[in-house]
Regions:
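Hydrophobic alpha-helical transmembrane segments
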Residues: 60-72, 91-105, 145-153, 196, ...
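Transmembrane helix-loop-helix hairpins in multi-pass inner-membrane proteins
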Residues: 129-185, 293, 298-330, 335
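Selected transmembrane alpha-helices and immediately adjacent juxtamembrane segments
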Residues: 21-80, 154-159, 163-237, 314, ...
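Alpha-helical membrane segments and immediately flanking helix-loop junctions
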Residues: 87-144, 239-298
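Hydrophobic faces of alpha-helical transmembrane segments in multi-pass integral membrane proteins
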Residues: 52, 56, 60, 69, ...
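Juxtamembrane "helix exit" motif at the C-terminal ends of alpha-helical transmembrane segments
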Residues: 60-70, 104-109, 220, 291-300, ...
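Alpha-helical membrane-embedding segments
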Residues: 103-125, 151-163, 182-185, 212-219, ...
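N-terminal amphipathic/basic-hydrophobic helices that include classical n-h-c signal peptides
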Residues: 1-24
Length: 336
């Protein structure tokens, strides 16, 4: 065979391979674009809903702060915090975190003179039950019971605080029963600060929700979700969670319950998770989520990260397996 003929064959093969590659790339981009189009309507709906909830809650919290109502509430319950080995001033940190978010609690904790023991206890309590109003609204949207979520998170926080006070070495922190007076800015300044912060939050929320929903859809489209599920399969069995909830569990632990809930809504909307599996996941992530940024911030304040993380994970495991037992008994004895 002549050299020129071989060159022609090789050239034809290169053209054929190039054509096949182009077709594959064209097909890949088509699948990506279709996946993005599919998530846009649901993402917009979720963003609008979460935006309304966020504006209402943050505005209400701004008023509570402006009129110094949160310090009054914390002063009222501060004696109870002796049960957790905490000074009364930490009540403001817990109440702020409970109704607002972790950052509010962290701001208060940073002003207090607390040792590692006290920071570990209050951090565990805050991470169990922060952003109660917003995150309960998100979980309710997934089908969870509001009463169950509030009781689970609140009682878990109180129990773990009491438990850690009993088992951690060292002495309870010295009692400080008064909370520092809050400086109040003019309402116009307070309102402008709230408006700017809320607008920034809404933009960030929209970007993150779109990005997560697109990522989740692409992972499903290209079969990567199955790999993630197989990788986390042993861990999901330990937690008592369905294997196909691996990605949602991962999202909730990395970016938090609010954004994780947005992805859950997208998943539930497509019927990917049965109701009971959703309830089990809700129970777990309600008290153990945001285990990257929030946990790191609490550690920076002096908390012991592995204690804060492990006690919440253990509590989540107990609660989920207890809920599985409840489902088993309901099915066996036809309980309603």
């Amino acid at each position: 065979m002549s050299a020129s003929r071989l060159d022609m064959i090789f050239f034809a093969l290169r053209l054929d391979n190039s054509y096949i590659w182009d077709r594959r790339m064209e097909n890949t981009w088509h699948r990506i674009s279709e996946s993005i189009k599919e998530v846009v309507p649901g993402s917009v709906k979720t963003i609008v809903w979460m935006g309304k909830i966020t504006v209402l809650i943050t505005f209400a919290m701004m008023l509570l702060k402006f009129f110094n109502i949160l310090p009054v509430i914390s002063d009222f319950i501060s004696p109870v915090f002796k049960l957790f080995g905490l000074p009364g001033a930490t009540a403001l940190a817990y109440i702020s975190g409970y109704f607002v978010n972790c950052y509010s609690a962290i701001a208060v904790i940073s002003t207090l003179d607390l040792d590692w023991r006290a920071v570990t206890i209050i951090a565990t309590m805050v991470l169990c039950s922060h952003s109660m109003v917003l995150e309960t609204a998100v979980l309710k949207k997934t089908g969870a019971s509001v009463v169950r979520v509030v009781l689970t998170r609140t009682l878990s926080a109180l129990f773990l605080g009491f438990f850690l006070n009993k088992v951690l070495p060292g002495s309870p922190a010295a009692s400080k029963d008064t909370v520092a007076q809050q400086w109040t800015l003019p309402f116009s300044k307070t309102f402008c600060d709230w408006l700017i912060a809320t607008l920034k939050l809404l933009v960030l929320m929209a970007v993150i929700i779109f990005a997560l929903n697109i990522l989740q859809r692409l992972l499903c489209e290209f079969g990567i979700m199955d790999l993630i599920s197989r990788f986390f399969k042993p861990l999901m069995y330990l937690f008592g969670l369905p294997v196909n909830a691996s990605f949602l569990w991962l999202v909730a632990n990395i970016v938090g319950l609010g954004y994780g809930g947005a992805v859950m809504l997208e998943e539930i909307g497509r019927g990917e998770l049965p109701d009971r599996d959703v309830q089990l996941l809700d129970t777990h992530i309600s008290i153990s989520h945001s285990n990257v940024e929030d946990l790191s911030l609490m550690t920076a304040l002096g908390g012991v990260w592995w204690i804060i993380l492990s006690v919440r994970l253990c509590a989540a495991i107990v609660l989920v397996w207890g809920q599985r037992l409840e489902y088993f008994l309901r099915d066996k004895y036809n309980w309603q």
